[in-house]
Amino acid sequence: RFNEVAVDVKMKGQRVTGVLTRERDNQGKLGPRHSYTGKVIIDATYEADLAEYADIPYRIGREARSKEEPHAGVIYTNYFRRVKGALPSTVLPESTGVADHRSQAFTYRITAKDYGRPDHPYRLKKPPPGYDPAKYSWNPRTRPIIPNGKFDLLGINWGGDLVGHGTRWVLADWEERVEIEKIYHYHDLGYLYYIQTKGGSPNVGLPDDEFQDNGNFPYRIYVRQGRRIEGLYTLTESDLHKDLRGDGFRGPLLPDSVAIGIYGIDAHRVQGPDGRKEPPYGKGAAEGTLHLHDATGPYQIPYGTLVPKDHNGILFPVGISCTHVAMCSVRMEPVWSSLGQAAGVAAALAIDNEQELKDVPVKQIQDELLKQRSVLLFYTDLPLDSPAFTAVQKLSLLGAVAGPDIDDYDTAGKSKGLGSLEMKAYRFRPNEPITMGEFSQLAVNGLQIPLSITASHFTDVPRGHAAFKYVETLYDYSTQSKQAFFDFEPSKDFRTALAHPDKKVSGAQAAKILSGLLKKKVPAPAQPDADLTRGEAAQLV
């Protein structure tokens, strides 16, 4: 229930069977206790306290640099400042990559309002305890960026960020967290006081129409990352990165996906000063900042990240099994919402099937998520109401959709970043005609036909061609069939041939190929001689 916090769990062996809670008001005062039991427990909190109570292994802090994680550990960058002699987005000296226990800065999600005059009633009359103006900076020319004359102070210069207490918060009990909340509360009020005084903007104050029962101040601290369980699958930087294992546009295909992310690897500072002038790296410099928007592409999150390795009856859709670097992107509310949806579906299926959570078939979870129009692989031009939506999503998870060729896109000299989401590379193009090369991959991988390659038969589909192994597989199965189903153009002496991978495919041709592969009649579309679109082909397969 709202305004209750978990303080312990009920266990039966390695199974979590219930949760013990206490009421907690907005001032942190703990009240009456409550007890809940359930067939499945879902811990969707930032802190993932239930992992601690249930002795479920978890990670906290930062992992060391590795092959899968070149940006892990202690790191200095110039993402938000210029460094003489360094190009933008550069990893700087003294970036040791050493692991530690630290977390990125926490804060409150403060909204402020421009009242247009300095004598408004929400101007702070005195600074909070411990106020130090050297911690802050503010440009008085800053203007409201959200409706109703309001500022998102969370996103302006990271002014409310405070390092050094994140890990302590996560590991603390609820009594100690009250004291930590005060530290952040005073720090963030100090930022607002600075804005109103030395910042030269006395017209700015807390909003009169928000958090009216809490002094117009947010109820909860913003925990950017908490515990991360040890799950059946651990998401790493290489699962998000476009280039480490991806195709230059998106992360690698993860067939067990139950959610997607589309946000850069973004970490606020982990160590360093608060707003003071500082050297670019080393002692006295801010450390831990990451902003890998150019290197991060749309990516997938497997079901195994929600499921503890050795415990039953509980899922973690927020404190998922991942590294610090991966969490720097996953930590967005739309992603956690999708993971929460997946957790709910998995829990319901486990109960209905009378199965352990780790034994629920991922395909069942995916099928239900697709019925609910959840996206499991990202496209810019495949709306949820598209007739081809479910088919394309399923086929994409099987690797049946031909990916883009990076050579076909002008990426040289440009930092595409999140703006690249408008590129053709992220489009499925459901209304465009499908080619034979594309259809060969759609059919072979979509029907999960084992590859069979006897030789390189076609001069226009040589080894190295994107469709090579799929065209050759169609040829091999066709020649073994009593009735050949793959058409090609042989030379007069039958020593070479053309497969025409760029030729459009008709509905009749597609049905003929599918019938041959499945060894049963597949009806052709209503207009068999018309060119088949990519969306129609997906539905047919």
Residue ranges of each PLM-predicted region?
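Conserved beta-strand edge residues that scaffold enzyme active sites
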Residues: 6-7, 65, 409, 488
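Feature responds to low-complexity, polar/acidic, surface-exposed segments characteristic
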Residues: 369-393, 401-511, 515-536, 541
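Flavin (FAD/FMN)-binding glycine-rich loop and adjacent Rossmann-like elements that form
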Residues: 2-6, 13, 18, 22-23, ...
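Short, composition-biased local secondary-structure segments
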Residues: 4-10, 307, 443-446, 525-526
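A short, hydrophobic/aromatic-rich structural module that often spans a beta strand
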Residues: 11-12, 466
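Residues that flank catalytic or metal-binding motifs in active/ligand-binding sites
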Residues: 2, 15, 102-106, 187, ...
